[in-house]
Design a protein with these regions (language model features):
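Flexible, acidic glycine-rich loops studded with aromatic residues
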Residues: 371-376, 383-387, 393-545
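Active-site neighborhood of glycoside hydrolase catalytic domains
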Residues: 270, 283, 287-386, 392-395, ...
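Disordered, acidic Ser/Thr/Pro-rich linker "stalks" and the adjacent N-terminal cap
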Residues: 591-649, 655-665, 669, 685-686, ...
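Low-complexity, disordered linker/stalk regions enriched in Pro/Thr/Ser/Gly
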Residues: 510-627
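Acidic, contiguous N-terminal accessory segments
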Residues: 20-152, 371-378, 474, 517-524
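Feature activates predominantly on carbohydrate-active enzymes
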Residues: 90-301, 305-318, 359, 363, ...
Length: 724
């Protein structure tokens, strides 16, 4: 009996080890070459982590995830050990991971290559590794993986200027990048909405410019309009972020966006702006200029102070200096900038930007740095070919940059701007495209028009997240940002790393069978594909294809329960569905009837003058047509919707501002309705510029009334009503 019990213990232990291993075909991103072997290697409590060469930091990194009792600097390896070593004859980020029954050996061309191998090894282990709670023994399948990246620049741009994200959370996203072998963090530190970097010679830039709203001279935008909100990174915090990223093979490339996108700086350093008095009649007296004057020598002295201190913080050879979306009308109105044009024989204001960036480039060179810019900045034709260009506007702009032999980071918004909606009914922008991870994975250089000659100037690929909308989605938590990034960032890693392009089916299999579970362990609130919902013959049915669990909600009660079988109903519009799995979830969706809206004939009028390009009649067209006024709102302004026939409906949602963004809207106000066409009753208060109205009576007219000025824009956006 004792012998039988001992055998059972051995069998159970073996079963546990077998369950721990992960199939090599589910590594994300897909390696270049994989040879599966027979058997497995077991890391035990007696295994030693042995390293040779300058990879001690990689060994220490592994200790954060794996409970090795001993790490050792040695070229000698004993059976049962895990070895990290460098082979200088390999390419810098190349690695070889060999797992035999006796040992694991990761060999890289440099620290970067070894670290890449570590990430692959971790993906062959149980997901508990990512919880930092794994215990030995751990089994790893025998294999030989030889791998190297397609591009040396595999980046992600994080905008912390528009929505503040503290240092600990930035480190979290650095960790998530590292797990996907992404190696460049483009750190968008300044914009119209905030200045996030401490400059000790000019402390007010951060201590004042890092906050908006309340008593700050930086006017609030996008949300949190009634409080002083924000933050900034001290230089010590930034140095810590840089070091933390470096251990994870990630280079931090800071961005100071100029000469445009500088409204926050202009609000606290008025002298950087052009030498004229702006007309503020359309903005309730607010000066909303956001462009550095290119003619003031004092501006270049300030820029030098900033760059001097940045060069002591950031180890990257590059500092991104912006160059996008510059409102050059401010230079046209500035006598000093016009005089500059004449003195330097500049043909147009675009060449003023060239002049400005050339001056900043000279400053960068004095501190051993090179410039990176957005693609608009090269349109003047005068920037040196060493300038690195980030092509964001379109693939055509990326092609144009590479055709001019600029080293180009390919990041067209329609594929790689992860602040875009993932479907029509989800949050996010839609100006570039509406897309999910399938489209990200589909990016193909050849199909986009890149020839072999173009590819010589492609330095890499980058995704970005601009954070205007994040501030309206509980920005103190990671849920919204996670949902927007994952699994799109996983798909980006495939495009940036893998030479052997995965099909959508192969990618989905890797996610469903392995990587979603890894992200569960990482605590990532990732997006799942939404359920497919159908309604026919009184039966409402839903299904998923990724193994997630379906739930439905009865909108009348708000109760959410697990979906087990089709629902018989004559009111499909009352039911919504979502899928859940681990820490992931899908968007809320429903049948066609759930999304159906009414579009009754309506006449719209307003007390605010409207642009002839977007007349008030647009608000009666429904859909995505909008109206732009020619000034901001004042207290007492109104927008009225008068129906051709009295309207009976379930709900009316009245919204000012952009459809997807809390901007250009009434900061405070209310909605009133008329049940007789003459007298109005106040029925709802505005929240973020909008309000829902529910009535059991027929409504003749609805009016949105402002009780304060609108936000810090020179217009109000008027939408059509959303009626159910």
């Amino acid at each position: 009996m004792k012998r039988l019990f001992a055998i059972l213990i051995i069998l159970v232990a073996t079963a546990q080890i077998t369950l721990a291993s992960v199939r090599v075909e589910y590594v994300v991103p897909q390696p270049t070459s994989v040879q599966s072997g027979n058997g497995e290697f077991v890391i035990s409590g007696k295994s030693c982590l042995v390293y040779s060469g300058a990879v001690r930091d990689a060994a220490l990194y592994m200790l954060e995830y794996l409970p090795f009792k001993q790490i050792l600097s040695s070229s000698k390896v004993m059976p049962g050990d895990v070895q990290l070593t460098i082979n200088r004859f390999m390419a810098e980020e190349q690695y070889r991971l060999e797992v035999t029954k006796d040992n694991i050996c990761i060999t890289g061309g440099s620290y970067a290559g070894v670290f890449n191998g570590v990430q692959t090894l971790m993906q062959l282990m149980p997901v508990e590794v990512y919880k930092k709670s794994a215990k030995f023994p751990i089994s790893v399948p025998c294999c030989v993986i030889e791998d190297s990246p397609k591009f040396g620049y595999r980046g992600f741009m994080l905008d912390v200027a528009r929505t503040w994200i503290d240092a600990s959370r930035v480190k979290r996203y650095i960790d998530l990048m590292a797990h996907l072998k992404l190696n460049k963090l483009h750190f968008h530190l300044t914009d119209d909405e905030g200045w996030r970097i401490e400059i000790k010679s000019h402390p007010e830039l951060a201590t004042i410019g890092g906050f908006r709203g309340g008593d700050s001279p930086v006017f609030p935008r996008y949300a949190k309009f009634d409080e002083r909100w924000g933050g900034y990174y001290t230089q010590e915090e930034l140095k810590d972020i840089v070091a933390y990223a470096a251990q994870r093979n990630i280079e931090v490339i800071p961005e100071i966006d100029m000469p445009g996108h500088s409204k926050a700086l202009g609000a606290i350093c008025r002298d950087i702006l052009c030498n004229y008095t702006p007309n503020t009649s359309a903005t309730n007296g607010l000066d909303i200029r956001n462009v550095w004057c290119a003619a003031k020598s004092s501006n270049y002295a300030l820029i030098e102070d900033i760059i001097r201190e940045m060069s002591q913080i950031f180890t990257s050879d590059y500092i991104h200096i912006g160059g996008d979306e510059v409102d050059m009308s401010q230079w046209k109105k500035c006598p000093d900038c016009q005089r500059l044009m004449a003195e330097h024989n500049l043909e147009n204001e675009k060449q003023i930007e060239d002049y400005f960036i050339a001056r900043v480039t000279e400053i960068l060179a004095r501190y051993g740095k090179q410039p990176a810019v957005w693609n608009e900045a090269i349109e003047g034709g005068l920037l040196p070919k060493t300038t690195r260009v980030h092509g964001w506007e379109s693939t055509k702009k990326c092609l144009a940059s590479t055709a001019k032999d600029y080293p180009t980071i390919v990041m067209p918004g329609e594929f790689f701007y992860f602040d875009m909606k993932q479907s029509a009914s989800e949050p996010g922008h839609n100006w570039a495209a509406i897309f999910d991870s399938r489209k990200v994975l589909s990016f193909d250089f050849a199909k986009a028009g890149f020839t072999a000659e173009h590819m010589k100037s492609v330095a890499g690929i980058e995704a970005s997240f601009f954070s205007e909308i994040f501030i309206a989605h509980n920005p103190e938590t990671n849920e919204y940002l996670d949902y927007m990034l994952f699994p799109r960032l996983c798909a980006l890693s495939e495009v940036a790393w893998s030479r052997n392009k995965r099909s959508w089916e192969q990618f989905s299999a890797a996610m469903n069978k392995a990587h979603f579970s890894r992200m569960d362990a990482m605590g990532v609130t990732y997006r799942l594909e939404p359920p497919k919902v159908t309604y026919a013959s009184g039966v409402l049915a839903a299904s998923v294809s990724d193994g997630s669990i379906l739930y439905y909600t009865d909108e009348r009660t708000g109760k959410s329960v697990k979906y087990n079988k089709p629902i018989t109903t004559t009111e499909p519009h009352n039911y919504s569905f979502e899928s859940r799995r681990g820490t992931g979830k899908s968007k809320t969706t429903g049948s066609t009837e759930y999304f159906a809206t009414l579009k009754p004939a309506v006449t719209v009028t307003t007390s605010i003058p409207c642009s002839s390009r977007t007349p008030i009649t647009n608000a009666a067209k429904y859909g995505n047509s909008i109206v732009r006024t020619t000034r901001a709102a004042k207290s007492g302004d109104w927008i009225e919707y008068r129906f051709e026939k009295p309207l009976k409906c379930r709900e009316i949602y009245a919204q000012t501002g952009h459809i997807h963004l809390r901007r250009c809207h009434f900061l405070a106000g209310y909605v009133e309705v008329s049940y007789d066409g003459e007298n109005f009753t106040r029925v709802a208060e505005l929240t973020d510029g909008g309000a829902a109205v529910v009535s059991d009576k027929a409504i003749y007219a609805l009016r949105i009334v402002a009780t304060s000025r609108s936000d810090a824009e020179n217009q109000v956006v008027i939408q059509s009503l959303k009626i159910k």
